[in-house]
């Protein structure tokens, strides 16, 4: 009888623990209230590294003089031109302001826009943007790495 009573109390205790552990977690921030921040890429971007077909060619030329200024009004300006997917100033846009994976450039006076891959990362606390281009020969793939210049 004592064994049966211990068994009953043990089962009751395990059942009580199991039932009380089923309380649902209530997060203070519900997904409906949370929103991802828009990635502001409008800035002065200085070319800091270039690779062609996976080979670093940064030291072959003074690439650091090349800047692309992405203005807040979605216009851009090229400074100290290097081979790029556009030759003149114009307007820019991204495919998604929250998760941008492509950037489009449209030169002033041109009908077609040029779309290319972009990437963002933070290195040593500083933002970097990579733009993948194939100017001229499509078998050559260039990856331009820009660092954000704060003036």
Model-predicted regions and their roles:
Residues 23-87, 97-151:
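Lipid interaction determinants
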Residues 1-9:
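Bacterial N-terminal signal peptides that target proteins for export
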């Amino acid at each position: 009888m004592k064994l049966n009573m211990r068994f009953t109390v043990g089962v009751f205790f395990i059942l009580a623990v199991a039932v009380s552990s089923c309380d649902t977690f209530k997060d203070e921030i519900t997904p409906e209230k949370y929103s991802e921040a828009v990635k502001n890429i409008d800035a002065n971007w200085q070319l800091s590294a270039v690779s062609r077909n996976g080979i670093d060619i940064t030291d072959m030329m003074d690439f650091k003089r090349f800047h692309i200024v992405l203005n807040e009004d979605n216009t851009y300006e090229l400074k100290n031109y290097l081979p790029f997917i556009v030759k003149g100033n114009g307007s820019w846009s991204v495919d998604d302001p929250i998760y941008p994976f492509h950037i489009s450039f449209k030169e002033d006076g041109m009908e077609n826009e040029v779309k290319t891959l972009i990437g963002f990362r933070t290195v040593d606390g500083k933002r970097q943007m990579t733009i993948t281009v194939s100017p001229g020969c499509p078998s050559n793939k260039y990856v331009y790495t820009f660092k954000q210049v704060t003036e």
